Structures are given as structure tokens and as C-alpha cells.
Amino acid sequence: MPEKKGSADAKVLHCSFCNKSQHEVRKLIAGPSVFICDECIDLCNDIIREEAQATARAAIRSELPTPAEIKTFLDQYVIGQTSPKRMLAVAVYNHYKRIRHGEIKGDEVELSKSNIMLIGPTGSGKTLLAQTLARMLNVPFVMADATTLTEAGYVGEDVENIIQKLLQNCNYDVEKAQRAIIYIDEIDKISRKSDNPSITRDVSGEGVQQALLKLIEGTVASVPPQGGRKHPNQDFVQVDTTNILFIVGGAFDGLEKVIRDRTEKSGIGFSAAVRAKSERGVGELFSEAEPEDLIKFGLIPELVGRLPVVATLDELDEAALVQILTEPKNALVKQFQKLFAMEGAELDVRPDALKAISRKALKRKTGARGLRSILEGALLDTMYDLPSQGNVSRVVLEANAVEGDGKPLLIYADESEAASGEKAGRGEVRDAAA
């Protein structure tokens, strides 16, 4: 006679790992001739998580460079800006040392996080500094634009979208994401319009600053899995931002006037000291920035207090722009020389052309960001014709081509072209317009 289901003699299933019966655990999952309970699954997850954390801690211990090594690495990619580099190197070193220190149990002293604010004119290297730091430290890096952020519930991106982008960059490895660097650009564009508290709601200005406070200081952010929308009944990915280093940057156009008004008050009447407005440059004025200046500019005091390290970048002059064109590892001239080498031609950018490019960028007031468009414009016609001309061995760029008064010179490798060039007068050099 077959056994009745649920009778006392029915077969009781046991976990193949801990041997607990199905009545002692909440869930028993069946596989091919084996079973595993929910308690063993939790234990396996804990073991995997501990191993991942140990790997991440070992990576931080073994790869933490000294401030001098960080600055040396930054020097290879970013020209000038010595003081900001030193400040960044020390702040980043102390941040990751703090993470290591926090893992030591039983220590009474807790080290607070030192987030960084970069202030400098457009094209001075703020974004490049943050990107280079992340590349050196081999940590996840994400860049966000503050101008697209709004308060939660309004059309636009809320601040938690930044953490969502970070998780996507890390393939949803939460442990790795919690040691990342986040760079928020254009932070000055979310300043409030007045230094007095606003009565009406400012969802893209002061409201965003309020939303960023806890994220920057350290909180557990709930992010929808795989970038989905938020639903009440779904499980969220929990990301602790306590050990994430936040770097914010902005051009702060108009801050120099706030600083000048504070530092150059000289009274009235015959005893007043008369000073020229243009005595000091923007970079020099930025170096004297105080928290009160940033608050008057439009940042709320709470946000300024959570960004204790303020590094100011100098304006780039002509000499610095020439260095940027030629000296860094990924210098612009080196990039174009590699492009021309792929076509079998050598690119020679003369010193007077480098100076002409730098002067043009200074007139545009775009800093180093405008160098590529100027160089691209000067070489555009040549790059268009070069693939069709297989006998060009060298391209010479001079100042007149940059200024629009001529074309780059082409030197041909073909002997017949050289011979015809000699009849015309001067060797094998021909104008690109020919």
C-alpha cells in the first residue's frame, strides 16, 4: 500500500552540506541528487564577500603610492599647476590611508573624509587632474555634470544617478564601487542666485546642493538594480559612500570679483589707496579664496564645510600652452604625429606655429581645451588630401598656416616630383595649395 503524502513515515529531506532536515530550515533547494538549505547559501555568500573584501584591502595596501609618487605621475600628463598637484597628492594619499586605518579594529580615533574642490578657469586642467588620479590609483572613476541634476521627484537626474553610473562602471561590484573617485563638474552652475536663503524652491540650484550633502559626507544610497526605475517592492543595491572620494570642480566665473571686493577695500576720501583693477590675475585672486567668498558666490555653507580641501588652478599662459602641446605623454602634437605616421608621413610642427596656436587659444579664452580645434583647423585640408597622395613623406606646419595666411608645406618622396620642384626653384618642397 503506498504511503500517504504527509504521513509520519514520509521521506524527510536533508541538506547535503549541514545535514539539517527540511523542517529545521526555511528553504531547501533541490539539485541533481543534492539539496542545499538557505543557511548554507547565506554562509557561502558571506565567505565570498569576505574574500572579495580581503582582495580589495590587499590591493589598497600594495598599490598606495606616496604623495611624491602621485605628483610625479601627474607631472607626466598635466603641465604646471604645482600647488594644486601637491594638495591633491596629499589629500588622495590621506584618503586611502584613512580607508586602511579604518579597517583596524579597536582603534578609538576615527578619521574624517577630506573631499576636494578644484577652482580654476576653463581649460586649466581640473577634469584632467581627476581623471589622471583615478588612472594611477586603478580605482573606478565616474564624472558627473552638476548642471543636469535636479531634486528627486523632478524631471532630470537625481544625485543617486551618479552612484548608478558608478555601479555600471564597476559591473555592479559594490565593494569596488565603495572605494571609487567621483568627479562632479560645473559645481558652480548650481549656485543659488543670492547669498540669502531662498523662499521659493530652487530644484536645480540650492535643491541639488542640499541633495548632495549626505552623499558627499557619507550615506548608504539605495540604487535600483541594473539601472531600472524605482518601484516600491523591488530590492535595491545598497552602496555606502563613506569611503568614496568626491572631487568637485568649477570655473567659478565671477568669484574673482567677490574676492577682490573683500580684499581691496580701501576706504573713501583722499586717504583711500587707488589700485588698478587688472593688477592681479584670476588665478592669483582664486588662491586667496575663503569659505565666506564661496558662500557669497552661491554655495550653501553646509556644502562648503564638506569640501575642506580647496585647490586653486592658475590661468595658463602662452609658455604653458606650448608645453601642453608638446610635453605630456599624450600631448596633442604627439597624437597628430601618430595620425600622420599611419599615412606614412612625418609631421613637423615648427616652434613659431606652436606659439601661434597658443596665442590663438588665449584670445579665445578657452584654455587648453581650445588647442585641439585650432590644430585640427590648421591641418584639416592636409588630412583630407593626404590619404589620396601616397608619396608625401613630410608635412611642415608653420605660423602662417595657423594664422590662415598659408597652407602646410608638403615634402614629397617621389623623385619625379622632387625634380619638377627643382625646376620651379626650391628643392622638393611644395605648398599644400598646389
Curated annotation (Swiss-Prot):
The keyword Metal-binding applies. One of its GO terms (cellular component) is HslUV protease complex. It comes from Bordetella parapertussis (strain 12822 / ATCC BAA-587 / NCTC 13253). ATP-dependent specificity component of the Clp protease. It directs the protease to specific substrates. Can perform chaperone functions in the absence of ClpP. One of its GO terms (molecular function) is ATP-dependent protein folding chaperone. PANTHER family: ATP-DEPENDENT CLP PROTEASE ATP-BINDING SUBUNIT CLPX-LIKE, MITOCHONDRIAL, ATP-DEPENDENT CLP PROTEASE ATP-BINDING SUBUNIT CLPX-LIKE, MITOCHONDRIAL-RELATED. Belongs to the ClpX chaperone family. GO terms for biological process: cell division; proteolysis involved in protein catabolic process. Transmembrane segments: none annotated. Zn(2+) binds at C15, C18, C37, C40. It comes from the Bacteria. ATP binds at P121, T122, G123, S124, G125, K126, T127, L128. Residues 3-56 form the ClpX-type ZB domain. NCBIfam families: clpX, PRK05342.1. This is ATP-dependent Clp protease ATP-binding subunit ClpX. Keywords: ATP-binding, Chaperone, Metal-binding, Nucleotide-binding, Zinc. InterPro entries: AAA+_ATPase, ATP-dep_Clp_protease_ClpX, ATPase_AAA_core, Clp_ATPase_C, Clp_protease_ATP-bd_su_ClpX, ClpX_bact, P-loop_NTPase, Znf_CppX_C4. Component of the ClpX-ClpP complex. Forms a hexameric ring that, in the presence of ATP, binds to fourteen ClpP subunits assembled into a disk-like structure with a central cavity, resembling the structure of eukaryotic proteasomes.
